[in-house]
Amino acid sequence: MAPPKKTVKKMDLTSFLNDDTFGSSWAEEDVDLNKITIPIETANANTIPLSELAHAKNNSNNTRSGGFGGSFGGRSRLDPALGGGSSDRREEYPVPDAPPYRAVINNIPWDITPEGVQAWVEDGLVKPEAVEEVVLPKNLRDPTRLKGNAFVTLKERADLVAVLKFNGTKLNERTVYVSVAAPRRGGGADVDWSSARGSNFQGDGREDAPDLDWGAARGSNFRGPRREREEVDIDWTAARGSNFQGSSRPPRREREEVDIDWSAARGSNFQGSSRPPRREREEPDIDWSAARGSNFQSSSRPPRREREEPDIDWSAARGSNFQSSSRPPRREREKEEPALDWGAARGAQFGKPQQTKNTYKDRSLTNKKTTDEQPKIQKSVYDVLRTEDDDEDEEAEKQNGDAKENKVDAAVEKLQDKTAQLTVEDGDNWEVVGKK
């Protein structure tokens, strides 16, 4: 079953704001501030004794300090609102009777220069060259900015007294305050500690800190700094026992090194270092040529002469049939076939039509064709790169080939002569073998 539809009533914004069905807005109700109460819990910790209030009042009237008084500059340690007025005032120093006569000018402009401060002081005194030195300390966190004060050293005491009258005057439309600078301690840097309370400046010669009443500042239960304890002379003999012997005995003497006879310790056959050191062996002069063989040639032979690089015409060497122009091309030698009388060598039956002989004849013709059809040796394109040594080797091979050919020709001629002397006669006791 479907849930029943909710009835929705539409109204405009004005009707909605003027609708008081559920009451008016809580923001329009008037609140009586006098009826608002704040509960305050009373405890012993929040109760301030009257005697302590009177003591804090007296300290606020009688104590002067440069930042921290007997009770935080005249305020109560429990509630600062119960104390008197603030006593954070700069300490005033008297005019010194001996140099240096230094004055401090506070709240100077940020864009002032030492020359500007010197001119301002001398113009006020109407006395040129009255200023001896001007120092403008810079901010440690930002060295590009000044710290806000200047230390002016004057040559005469009367000028310092006159400069103090410039207090509260204008310097570049800015009110400045002039006072006697604190005396230097140990030749340290010029630091205005009253204006540098919140800085992290650490000078070389820091001024002595004022004697502050830290006990009143930290509470009644605060204990001051511990004093250094004196070293107690303890009787260690009683602590160590009745049989302990003090340090009255003389110190131990150093033991002398014993000269040990290591030869006896190492054995009866040990020989010490008394024998002379071994002499170095001389290297024998070995005849390496005899050791390497009878055919070895030493390096005393003259160096090989450098070969002259031939002037190669590479443009002419691009073709396959390139022939060097330095010498005529070598002609191919044709082998001379000896004229043999094969008829006399083969017998009386030579020339008859026989199948076997025809077969051998065809084979001999084939071998002859093969010999005739052997490819001729062609010169390579790189034949031009051959050097003189290659030519010499080629000439030697050529001579060896000619000698071998001459030997073959002589053997063939000898065989021909012997073959020519053969005769096939019936009376020569030749046996004819026929087919079976």
Swiss-Prot record:
Sequence ranges of Basic and acidic residues compositional bias: 329-338, 359-376, 397-406
Effect of N106 to G/V/Y: Retention of function
Keywords: Initiation factor, Phosphoprotein, Protein biosynthesis, Repeat, RNA-binding
Cleavable signal peptide: none
Region span, 7 X approximate tandem repeats: 190-350
GO CC term, one of those recorded: nucleolus
RRM domain segment(s): 101-183
BP-aspect Gene Ontology terms: cytoplasmic translation; eukaryotic translation initiation factor 4F complex assembly; formation of translation preinitiation complex; translational initiation
MF GO annotations: mRNA binding; ribosomal small subunit binding; RNA binding; RNA strand annealing activity; RNA strand-exchange activity; single-stranded RNA binding; translation initiation factor activity
Disulfide bonds: none
SUPFAM superfamilies listed in its UniProt record: RNA-binding domain, RBD
Positions annotated as Sequence repeat: 190-210, 211-232, 233-258, 259-284, 285-310, 311-340, 341-350
CDD domains named among the record's database cross-references: RRM4_RBM12_like
The protein's role, per its UniProt record: Involved in translation initiation. May be the homolog of mammalian eIF4B and be part of an RNA helicase. STM1/TIF3 is a non-essential gene.
Remaining remarks: Present with 24000 molecules/cell in log phase SD medium.
Name assigned to this protein: Eukaryotic translation initiation factor 4B
Lineage: Eukaryota, Fungi, Dikarya, Ascomycota, Saccharomycotina
Originating gene: TIF3
